[in-house]
């Protein structure tokens, strides 16, 4: 098996990490050291993390994407249609950099908050389907209805939590739990 075949079978999946590994090869860093590093490498949670597939729709937890730039990279990394679960905010967030990417990749936006005005206004001309959800369970349920075969559902908030003490890990876990609930219902 060639080095690049071994690399493609490794746990490194994001383009930036692959580029780093390939650079190591170009710089002639010992293969054994690279293999050891790859085997020790753990995927950080809530960063474009695959959750499950339900009825040919893949679900990803990107709760760590608490700004427009991070969400942009999530959209940029896929070619499949996206059902995007995002959070509204009282902050005056500038979504300009995300508009074109959303227009190209996002088929539906589900706004998770009661502070969605800025979010909805920003994307009303870029995304045809925009919905409001009162909580994560409702957002994931709506996403499971809107999504079709080969779509992906991504929770990528694009802003910090409006709840003062809520972490991205907590929001990501809420998403994962809601997805698992849908999955359990699907298998009954």
Locate predicted features:
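Glycine-rich phosphate/diphosphate-binding loops and the adjacent beta-loop-alpha structural elements
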Residues: 6-8, 18-26
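Internal glycine-rich flexible loops
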Residues: 6, 17, 31-32, 38
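ATP-dependent carboxylate-amine ligase
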Residues: 22-30, 36, 40-46, 50-188
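A short glycine-threonine-serine/GTX helix/turn-capping micro-motif
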Residues: 2-12
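Short, conserved micro-motifs enriched in small and acidic residues
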Residues: 10-15, 65
């Amino acid at each position: 098996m060639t080095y690049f075949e071994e690399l493609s079978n490794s746990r490194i999946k994001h383009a930036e990490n692959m580029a780093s590994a390939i650079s190591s090869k170009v710089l002639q860093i010992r293969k054994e050291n690279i293999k050891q590093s790859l085997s020790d490498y753990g995927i950080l949670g809530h960063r474009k993390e695959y959750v499950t597939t339900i009825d040919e729709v893949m679900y990803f937890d990107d709760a760590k994407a608490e700004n427009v730039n991070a969400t942009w990279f999530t959209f940029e990394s896929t070619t499949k249609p996206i059902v995007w679960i995002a959070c509204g905010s009282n902050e005056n967030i500038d979504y300009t950099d995300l508009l074109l990417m959303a227009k190209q990749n996002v088929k539906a936006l589900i706004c998770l908050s009661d502070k969605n005005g800025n979010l909805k206004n920003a994307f009303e001309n870029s995304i045809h389907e925009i919905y409001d959800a009162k909580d994560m369970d409702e957002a994931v349920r709506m996403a499971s209805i809107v999504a079709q075969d080969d779509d992906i559902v991504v929770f990528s908030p694009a802003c910090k939590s409006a709840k003062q003490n809520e972490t991205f890990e907590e929001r990501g876990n809420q998403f994962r739990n809601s997805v698992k609930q849908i999955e359990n219902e699907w298998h009954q």
